């Protein structure tokens, strides 16, 4: 079986010489300390106005590793981590790598019963927790075997002045974090304060196959699973990044927009920034405005489409507001104009500093991408990946960007497009399921061999492949064009419908902001398309424009692809991992269909 890579010269899209040639056969602790040893004065972290150098980061990680060692955490044991993006993430990665422990990263938005399951399934005896999660951990700890809870606060990393201001704000807001009277709970600073820095443990030796990190899947298409990776996988992932034409240069600043419990945030952002001796500008929030608010602080951002959509919307509204205020000669208008002009200057200066915006986690349509790039006068690089392949696997070349595609395979990545039913490789131009092979595929779904074997397959040449579940085709230049999820295929009578095709047609209508198409159960067919639509202008009457939308679909789509239902929503729902929540829309859609059927029945009676 030959992969599609053999038909395209992908090397031309990669650097001939990588930014950095890493030794992959070492621990993450070893890689970061060896890469930064001659540049310890460089900034490793920016957090809420305070910076930490590589020297200070490594010293603090050594102390944390020793503190873990002192409570008898050994090579191969598991530590659960529930935290926002803040320096404790870097300290945890390095310290737990140093002692050979396995890190289990848990989504902060998980339900209590799921947190219990994640902790117990990975046999964690120690937890590192963001202080706002303390009430949750306190309520469930007796249902686990946890012996120690290390509580970290953003205030641990603030400058003295900002820390005082933050404390005053908490007091005003009535926020008070009190540790329970329980010896299992300890504050981070107390946990490490008595460590003897003159008697630190020796780092463990590297083991290529040792499970080192556990992350959760997004759960957007099924029950969330725990995905096991090795340190080699993380090292291999950053090596592949070094072959892209993106500016992962020593001393540059990377904006950390994605939380650490998502592998795109943990591996491609936080760990990668340390591997390249860059500064990680960490934003502790997960809101859509984080990139916009931090413009001017970074050279490259790895974020999700929703972050760039927010930037685009704010910049358009800012310019529109300034135009209106310039027509008003009142004193209040002049004051507001001055404020708006100051904000515009900040935004434009920040965009000018940024060398590139990288987008992943969800799609950006071709028209939308072009419009945003023209507005920012900056390249937006589309990327694609999944948890099983440790984040980014396919990236658009910065200087050969093709809107509408997700790019080309990164160095060391092989892809093939197959018939989902026969697994036969399809020729260039035909739509099928994307399979991915590389040296950093996941080890397994924890304690779930059946699900592991469903997604991880071995061909006749003993090469491992991961089924992505995504539909795509490869164009004549080797670029990969997404066509939705294989698992989202709508089966209408004898037809298989890809929702992406319908979404592109509807999204091209000027007054449409966003569109998601899902399959819903119908009285006549097993499944039919329902289009959920967000309008740009909230004052528009959806009833008045719905016929125009349907006419557009009738003009451009085969009859069987024209949606049976068109519904308006205020905004598209997203999963905790910033992916469109198809399951929620399917449930909403089926509820709408049932209600329509019930009303028809009542009328007949």
Q: What are these model-predicted stretches?
A:
Residues 408-412, 424-457, 497:
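Conserved ATP/PPi-binding loop(s) of AMP-dependent carboxylate-activating enzymes
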Residues 47-52, 65-110, 259, 496:
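Conserved AMP-binding/adenylate-forming
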Residues 299-300, 314-402, 414:
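Gly/Ser/Thr-rich phosphate-binding loop
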Residues 235-253, 261-302, 306-338, 342:
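Conserved AMP-binding/adenylation subdomain of ANL enzymes
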Residues 110, 438, 443-444, 453, ...:
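AMP-binding/adenylate-forming catalytic core of the ANL superfamily
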Residues 3, 152, 555-580, 598-604:
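AMP-binding/adenylate-forming catalytic domain of the ANL superfamily
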Residues 58-64, 193-195, 208, 227-247, ...:
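Conserved structural elements of the adenylate-forming
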Residues 53-55, 203, 212-236:
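Conserved AMP-binding A3 loop
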């Amino acid at each position: 079986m030959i992969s599609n890579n053999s038909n395209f010269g992908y090397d031309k899209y990669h650097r001939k010489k990588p930014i950095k040639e890493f030794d992959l056969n070492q621990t993450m602790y070893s890689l970061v300390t060896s890469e930064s040893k001659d540049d310890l004065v460089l900034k490793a972290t920016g957090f809420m106005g305070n910076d930490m150098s590589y020297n200070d980061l490594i010293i603090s990680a050594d102390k944390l590793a020793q503190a873990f060692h002192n409570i008898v955490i050994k090579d191969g044991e598991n530590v659960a981590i529930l935290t926002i993006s803040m320096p404790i993430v870097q300290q945890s990665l390095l310290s737990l790598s140093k002692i050979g422990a396995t890190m289990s990263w848990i989504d902060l938005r998980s339900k209590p019963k799921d947190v219990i399951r994640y902790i117990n399934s990975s046999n964690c005896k120690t937890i590192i927790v963001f202080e706002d999660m303390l009430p949750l951990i306190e309520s469930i700890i007796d249902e686990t075997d946890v012996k120690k809870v290390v509580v970290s606060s953003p205030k641990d990393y603030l400058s003295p002045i900002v820390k005082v201001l933050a404390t005053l704000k908490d007091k005003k807001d009535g926020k008070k974090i009190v540790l329970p009277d329980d010896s299992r709970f300890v504050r981070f600073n107390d946990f490490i304060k008595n460590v003897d820095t003159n008697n630190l443990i020796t780092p463990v030796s590297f083991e290529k196959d040792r499970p080192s990190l556990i992350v959760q899947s997004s759960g957007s298409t099924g029950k969330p699973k725990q995905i096991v990776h090795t340190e080699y996988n993380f090292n291999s992932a950053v090596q592949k990044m070094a072959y892209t034409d993106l500016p992962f240069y020593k001393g540059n600043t990377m904006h950390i927009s994605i939380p650490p419990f998502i592998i795109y945030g943990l591996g491609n952002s936080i760990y990668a920034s340390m591997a390249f001796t860059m500064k990680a500008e960490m934003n502790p929030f997960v809101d859509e405005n984080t990139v916009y608010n931090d413009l001017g602080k970074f050279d490259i951002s790895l974020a999700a489409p929703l972050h760039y959509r927010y930037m685009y919307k704010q910049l358009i509204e800012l310019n529109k507001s300034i135009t209106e205020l310039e027509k008003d000669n009142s004193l209040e208008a002049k004051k507001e104009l001055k404020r708006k002009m100051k904000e515009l200057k900040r935004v434009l200066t920040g965009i000018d500093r940024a060398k590139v915006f990288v987008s992943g986690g969800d799609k950006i349509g071709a028209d939308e991408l072009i419009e945003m790039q023209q507005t920012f006068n900056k390249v937006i690089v589309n990327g694609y990946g999944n948890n099983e392949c440790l984040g980014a696997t396919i990236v658009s070349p910065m200087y050969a960007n093709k809107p509408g595609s997700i790019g080309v395979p990164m160095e060391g990545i092989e892809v093939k497009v197959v018939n989902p039913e026969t697994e036969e490789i399809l020729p260039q131009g035909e739509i099928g399921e994307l399979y991915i092979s590389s040296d950093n595929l996941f080890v397994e779904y924890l304690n779930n061999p059946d699900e592991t074997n469903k997604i991880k397959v071995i061909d006749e040449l003993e090469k491992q492949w991961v089924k992505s579940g995504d539909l795509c085709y490869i164009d004549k230049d080797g670029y990969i064009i997404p066509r939705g999820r294989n698992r989202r295929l709508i089966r209408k009578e004898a037809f298989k419908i890809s929702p992406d095709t319908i979404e592109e047609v509807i999204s091209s209508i000027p007054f449409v902001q966003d569109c998601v198409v899902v399959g819903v159960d119908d009285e006549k067919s097993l499944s039919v398309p329902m289009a959920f639509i967000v309008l740009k202008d909230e004052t528009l009457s959806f009833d008045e424009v719905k016929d125009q939308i349907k006419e557009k679909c009738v003009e451009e789509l085969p009859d069987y692809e024209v949606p049976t239902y068109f519904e308006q929503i205020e905004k598209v729902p997203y999963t905790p991992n910033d992916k469109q929540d198809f399951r929620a829309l399917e449930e909403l859609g089926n509820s709408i269909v049932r209600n329509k059927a019930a009303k028809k029945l009542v009328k007949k009676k």
